[in-house]
Amino acid sequence: MKRISIKEVEKILEEKRNLIKVDLRFADLHGAYLHKNFCGADLRFADLSRADLRGAILSCADLRFADLRGADLRNTGLNLTDLRFTDLRGANLSGTELNLADLRFADLRGTILPETKTVGANFLFSARD
């Protein structure tokens, strides 16, 4: 699968106000500012390391195997999101909603988690400090 470049993603962002159900598998979004609605988006294997996703809506999105190392996810909606095998090392999840999210096998070492809502979230086999 070809990795989508940041320029291609910027073009998509210009054309759409929200990115509901958008296919961004393998996208290179390293360090991008993405304050959008990604509800139901496919972001499997995407590089979102150091991305600024503050306040974004990622509910019901598929983020399996995504790289979210050092990402700013403060106050982000991640309800019902598939985060299995996601690398979240050093990510800031302050005030994030992870209700019913699937975090099995996710790497959560060094994450910032104050005031995070996790009702019904599945952390089975996830790596934590």
Tell me the role of every PLM-derived stretch.
Residues 1-129:
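Tandem repeat scaffolds
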